[in-house]
């Protein structure tokens, strides 16, 4: 388990240093053991600086979870953190994670809003630009699917109407 937590912390460290992958589809997933480890670390944290660091790790793990309930918990934590942030770099990190959480939960509109705020803070962020592209691609894909469903429904109704008129 310590090795798994070590890998997560390395990923978190890479994320915060900008070395993490820029593709929104390549984010790592966390399991419940990693989240439990982050929760334990937070509970054991003594000073305020360490607690803030542990909260960020936990929120990172939650939005990268396989479980939708964990993702929602991470979103709630990050929403509370974003309100009180004055540091531009920390705000960018939180907005990116919040956008990723919304993206993973299927709320693409909120995800896009957060990633645009993130890009206002740091326009050159490759991660944020990649996530924005993934969000926009997904919105377009969902729109095309929606149009396809509507066209199919109209075709079915027209077919039924034509069949009734022939009878």
From Swiss-Prot:
InterPro entries for this protein: Fis1, Fis1_cytosol, Fis1_TPR_C, Fis1_TPR_N, TPR-like_helical_dom_sf, TPR_rpt
Leader peptide range in chain numbering: none
Function: Component of the peroxisomal and mitochondrial division machineries. Plays a role in promoting the fission of mitochondria and peroxisomes. In association with PEX11C, PEX11D, PEX11E and DRP3A, is involved in cell cycle-associated constitutive self-replication of preexisting peroxisomes.
Record-annotated membrane-spanning stretches: 144-164
Family per record: Belongs to the FIS1 family.
Subcellular location(s) of the protein: Mitochondrion outer membrane; Peroxisome membrane
Superkingdom of source: Eukaryota
General remark: Plants silencing FIS1B show reduced growth, increase in the size of mitochondria and decrease in the number of mitochondria per cell. Overexpression of FIS1B increases the fission of peroxisomes and mitochondria.
GO CC, one annotated term: mitochondrial outer membrane
Membrane-related topology note: Single-pass membrane protein
Name this protein carries in UniProt: Mitochondrial fission 1 protein B
TPR repeats: 92-125
Pfam families for this protein: Fis1_TPR_C, Fis1_TPR_N
Alphabetical UniProt keywords: Membrane, Mitochondrion, Mitochondrion outer membrane, Peroxisome, Peroxisome biogenesis, TPR repeat, Transmembrane, Transmembrane helix
This protein's record includes keyword Mitochondrion: yes
Record comment regarding domains: The C-terminus is necessary for mitochondrial or peroxisomal targeting, while the N-terminus is necessary for mitochondrial or peroxisomal fission.
Assembly notes: Interacts with PEX11A, PEX11B, PEX11C, PEX11D and PEX11E.
GO biological process, one term: peroxisome fission
CDD domains given in the database record: Fis1
């Amino acid at each position: 388990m310590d090795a798994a937590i070590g890998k997560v912390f390395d990923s978190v460290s890479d994320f915060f240093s900008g070395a993490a992958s820029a593709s929104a589809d390549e984010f790592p997933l966390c399991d419940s053991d990693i989240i439990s480890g982050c929760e334990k670390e937070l509970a054991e944290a003594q000073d305020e600086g360490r607690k803030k660091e542990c909260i960020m790790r936990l929120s990172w793990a939650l939005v990268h979870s396989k479980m939708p309930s964990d993702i929602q918990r991470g979103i709630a934590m990050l929403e509370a953190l974003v309100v009180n942030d004055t540091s531009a770099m920390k705000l960018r990190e939180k907005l990116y994670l919040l956008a990723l959480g919304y993206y993973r939960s299927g709320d693409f509109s909120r995800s896009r809003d957060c990633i645009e705020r993130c890009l206002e803070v740091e326009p050159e962020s490759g991660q944020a630009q990649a996530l924005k592209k993934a969000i926009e691609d997904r919105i377009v894909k969902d729109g095309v699917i929606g149009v396809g469903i509507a066209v199919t429904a109209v075709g079915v109704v027209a077919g039924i109407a034509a069949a009734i008129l022939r009878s």
